[in-house]
Amino acid sequence: MASVFVGCSGNDPADAIGNADPTTDQGVSFSLTEPDFGEEETMGVRSCNWKNAVDTTDLGDGVLGEVSMSKEQGDITTRAATRTLSNGRYTVLAYDASGSLKAKINATVVSGEFSSKDIMILEPATYTFVCLNDKVDLSEGGVISVSQANAATARIGRTVKSVSGTRMKVPFVMYHVGLRVRVSLEAMVNIPNNVKAMIFDDSGNTPTVTNYDPITGTYSAGAVGTFSGPEEIFPSTGSTDFTKEKYISSPKSNTYHYLLPNQSSSIQLKFTSGDQIYHKDLAGRTMTPYKNMVLEPNATYLLNVKLTKVFKYVFDDGTVGFLRNKGTRKPIALVISETDRSAIALHDANNGVQTIWTVKRNDYNNPVAEYPSQRDQIPATSQGLHWTWDASGSKDGITIKANEPVKCPAFYHAAHYDPGVVVTGTNLSKWYLGANTDWKNLYLYVGFGTNTKVNANSSPCPWYYHVIDKAFTDAGGTTVSNTDPNASSNALRKYWSATYYRDFDTGLMHIFKNGYTDGNHSISERDLALIRAFIHY
């Protein structure tokens, strides 16, 4: 049986108590609608005055975690008043212009219906009406509050209406008090296996109880503490598709975390386990989005962690670093191995014109003792500089191939590559024709190919050609990939290698438009291929 409070001249809402006559032509009845969590809004664009919605955590070695927090598109379809409402107890409060509580109804919804006796009799005036579901606490002193345990289910509706004395219906839109957060991982390469992470806020300022001001319709922390969500598993995106520009993984269970509104959140995400990504361990790494976030009630937030790779470059003065710190320096080469201290030129040599390797390979070749087998493991140290610039790197022990534009054009044009700027770094080697080691390093450490034992005898191997393209173009370079939109999927670009195999002839790097690479070979002395220079720093 519903209690009815009739507002009188006093401030006591219990001045008159009884059940209203449902046939009366006076009084206020109520209807409820229950919308889902709100629609998407990128933080910093609408209501939140953020200067920056993205924060970056440096994981080292050029791996960055770009963390953003945005409002997501939710199901904004509002349940019509005639649709089934959530069963339970509802409390309706009426406050006058001075903020005094004038009336209160405790009503129960069964099978989606309010009792016809749930009517409030009020004197003509303007009132603030507030409706609470049974997950909202109302103290004897009139304090409205919600605990963290009820963040997912507590709802409050509020509206201001003028009562004239005739029968009227006041509609409530019952919004969620809490907000929900889901986490998504994004990367330029496949999300690896065994990735687990959890969100938390250990600042000590997370609301564990939130108080609601019915007059202003605002929330404030009633009690604060810490928050720790459950560990979530992020499925791998696989290991066979290398063609996408981005790979996304979201947990299949525990999709949402529910929190109370917060004017200054410091939510973070910590990886608790996971295989390597970009050759970097994830476990133990913590990602922090933009601090002091305003988390609003009834909102759906996406905490997106974008794991990106930025590369180091060799600059004109011989220094090495990231583009973000380049200042007035000019990049001339992309670092492919910090172990071998090697880098690849940003553009093709010889203005992109193909040439032969040497005119007579029997005469102008590498030393016979230095011919590897196509099945040999590719060495960690490149011989390219030696074969290009040392007389001892030639078969006859006399010829310096770097100085022979007619006899050894591939070596010559690599050795005389012009990066377009004056190079002043005294620590830099001369430019050279890259060997199999250099091309393998490009495949593994820039293209993030997965065959760590790749050699000239290997079958074609895929790499992340979008990452390759970005690494070159970010620095104003020309990618080694085939970007011709009219080319067929098996169209390729061929680059010379400085390596000559005893059972495979001259090495080539085949780069197919479909994202595959292949350490191939050239048999004919008339074969033409492109030239890309390399350098040591």
For each of these PLM feature ranges, what is it?
Residues G88, V177-L179, D340, S429, ...:
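Residues that flank catalytic or metal-binding motifs in active/ligand-binding sites
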Residues I336-Y432, N436-G449:
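Short aromatic-cysteine micro-motif
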Residues K494-W496, G519-Y537:
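Short, structured beta-strand segments at or near domain termini in extracellular proteins/domains
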Residues L295-G352:
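GGW-centered surface loops in extracellular recognition modules
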Residues V130-L132, R182-S184, A343-A345, K430-Y432, ...:
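Residues within well-ordered beta-strands of beta-sheet-rich folds
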Residues T78-T84, V422-G425, S522-S524:
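Short consensus segments that form the blades of beta-propeller domains
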Residues F411-K430, N436-K513, H536:
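An exposed tryptophan-centered "aromatic clamp" motif
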Residues F5-F311, V359, Y364-D390:
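Sec-type signal peptide cleavage vicinity
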